[in-house]
């Protein structure tokens, strides 16, 4: 259980989570399943750089319904440019501080384009498509998640992590912060996890004792006994 402040994005906590896993277990996992909230290029790059295969939930990206989405444009890795549905090139112009490359079309070409109204907003003069510098890592993670092995690994996430987290929130009060400070919240989270583990231990003991009880009374009596 990794506790952070409410003003810290979950994606920013990935390096600390990996360090904590490695310090506790002595090694890092080969695969890591994450929900759609972690579906971005920096997270995929961080995991792959540590030899961890990301298994990410799909995020349906939003865009204006009256304009063409980014996925309608074809990327050419050799020329480092995009091609629009009409065949025009969008060349790389700049890279912002967040690591996104901006590919822009020629305003003079877009002015007379027949698909201009469906391509971008009326107030704009050209189409701009962004691509992260680590987009290749995200595309590799998406491709693996769609494979049978990736689907199988991701299905285990909802049976284990999501189920445990839902029980902690619904049944054990982890939905609300009952203490102040990160140290106190870690204490609440660890106590909640301890309670869940004790419930699992009690359930397993009851199942094993029930099996022994049934097998004992279902065994036929020895005929040599009086």
PLM regions: where:
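Anion-binding and metal-coordination hotspots
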Residues: 1-226
